[in-house]
Amino acid sequence: MIKIENISYGYKSNHPIFNDISLEIGNGIYGLLGENGVGKTTLIHLICGLLFPWKGECKIDNCNSVQRSPELLCHYFFLPEEMQMPTESIYQFAAHHSVFYPHFSRKEFEQNLEELHIDGKQKLSTVSYG
């Protein structure tokens, strides 16, 4: 569960984007819709602990996201819309980064690749984001 309590934040001190907002997001799949520039990405960054609210707090499963604790980070991963992808293979990338996720299962990883018809030897930079 994601819980946002009384968050205020803005890029300029005299112009808040969010002013004392609160909401709870339960388990499930959600979409975040809004006009260009209204703060969708900023909200996601606040939830992930990549930005720090002026006031209030964001919690994911009762862990304050700003603290970026290992018990929180080992269960969640934020994949930005645009990012530089490494030129190593999918298998190499998984081998290098799976050590940061104690619950990573090589077996599940292999099953997911198979279900999605993705070749693990393929360079990560060539895989579709879709």
Regions found by a protein language model. Give the residues of each.
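Conserved A-loop
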Residues: 8-13, 25, 60, 101
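Short beta-strand immediately N-terminal to the Walker A/P-loop
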Residues: 30-32
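Walker A (P-loop) phosphate-binding loop of ABC-type ATPase nucleotide-binding domains
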Residues: 34-39
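Conserved structural motif at the start of ABC-family nucleotide-binding domains
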Residues: 2-4, 16-20
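ABC-family P-loop ATPase nucleotide-binding domains
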Residues: 78-130
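Helix-to-loop junction immediately C-terminal to a conserved catalytic motif
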Residues: 48
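Short coil-to-beta microelement around the adenine-binding A-loop and adjacent beta1/P-loop entry
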Residues: 14-16, 70
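Conserved ABC transporter NBD signature motif
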Residues: 56-67, 71-72
